[in-house]
Amino acid sequence: MLEEWILKKKEIESSKDRLNGADLCYAKLMEAELSDANLEEADLTAAYLIRADLSGANLSGADLTQAVLSEANLSGADMNEAELTDTFLNGANLQGVLNLTCDQIELANFDKDTIFPSYIRIKWSNDRICECVDGN
């Protein structure tokens, strides 16, 4: 089972330029190297992308519902109209992410370790309640 998972992950990594529209639901892509990947309109519902490198990736229109992106590097990724309902962004690096809105963020799960782009500010009133302010 582990060997099968590793082979599938390597296959996905090697075709990262051609993943637009791909069905990657429930994919196990922990620590995957997907920098600059074309994941436009990809279905990543409930995918495990813990500590994955998605820097510079095109995630426009991608469905990340319930995906786990804890500690993932999304710096410089394009998240235009990406679906983030119940997405886990705890500790994720979103610095320099393009086209991310408060409407998207408010649907996701994140914590004080999540790094947001400079145009997004999170105002915490306590550990669980916050307000997102979009500077765009």
Task: For each feature predicted by the language model, list its residue ranges.
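Tandem repeat scaffolds
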Residues: 1-136
